[in-house]
């Protein structure tokens, strides 16, 4: 099938009729129609609470990272220490992280957090201190109250699906999450029992009144 990716196109409105989304509208007033809609807005998913009449309890959790330049194949394996880790890349870089902070949508890296990351990483591999740091940055993780993502049909809507709230495991769980959601939408046998991920959890004492 033909697939078109439309970048830099923030969506601002669901057009809901009789429990079904007929279309969505972007900030530039463009209207998009589809048979099924999937919410994959990560840390920003709570934005849809009012429109969908649901309290979506997904919050941003900041994580900071540091990137080293090392020789290729210098570090042969991933290392972990408490909540910190070292991940070698094929191009000779080593990713070091990561922190956790509840500071809203702030993505400003700080010197203090950098030092905390470095201390933990040098404890694992002291030799890493000999190599240059090429980058420090901060991102946002979508945290759910239990750490379990929401994957499946949204409550009270016939054609809206959730795939958000993966917290620290978005990249790791992404392919399996997409596969599971595809199976649910197409009513195919699922690779695992989807009950634990079901968005019906959003209706448990959290519906707005």
Language-model region placement:
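A conserved short coil-to-beta-strand element within the FAD-binding core of flavoproteins
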Residues: 7-22
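General beta-strand recognition
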Residues: 23-25, 95, 161-162
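Active-site substrate-recognition segment that forms the wall
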Residues: 31-32, 36-158
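C-terminal catalytic lobe of FAD-dependent flavoproteins
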Residues: 125-209
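General small-molecule cofactor/ligand-binding pocket signal
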Residues: 4-6, 134
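Short, hydrophobic/aromatic-rich segments at coil-to-beta transitions
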Residues: 19-24, 74-76
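Short, conserved active-site loop motifs that form the nucleotide-linked donor/cofactor pocket
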Residues: 3-4, 160
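Glycine-centered tight beta-turn/hairpin loop motif at sheet-sheet or coil-to-beta transitions
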Residues: 27-29
């Amino acid at each position: 099938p033909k697939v078109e990716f439309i970048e830099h196109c923030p969506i601002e409105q669901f057009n809901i009729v009789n429990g079904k989304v007929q279309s969505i509208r972007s900030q530039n007033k463009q209207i998009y129609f589809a048979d099924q809609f999937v919410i994959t807005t990560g840390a920003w998913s709570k934005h849809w609470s009012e429109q969908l009449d649901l309290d979506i309890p997904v919050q941003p959790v900041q994580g900071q990272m540091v990137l080293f330049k090392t020789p290729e194949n210098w570090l042969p394996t991933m290392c972990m220490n408490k909540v910190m880790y070292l991940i070698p890349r094929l191009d000779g870089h080593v990713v070091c992280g990561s922190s956790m902070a509840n500071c809203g949508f702030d993505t400003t890296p700080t010197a203090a957090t950098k030092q905390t990351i470095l201390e933990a990483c040098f404890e694992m591999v002291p030799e890493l201190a000999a190599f240059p740091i090429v980058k420090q940055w901060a991102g946002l993780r979508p945290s759910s109250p239990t750490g379990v993502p929401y994957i499946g049909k949204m409550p009270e809507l016939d054609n809206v699906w959730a795939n958000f709230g993966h917290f620290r495991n978005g990249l790791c769980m992404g392919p399996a999450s997409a596969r599971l959601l595809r199976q649910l939408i197409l009513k195919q046998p699922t690779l695992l029992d989807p009950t634990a991920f079901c968005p019906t959890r959003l209706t448990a004492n959290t519906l707005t009144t």
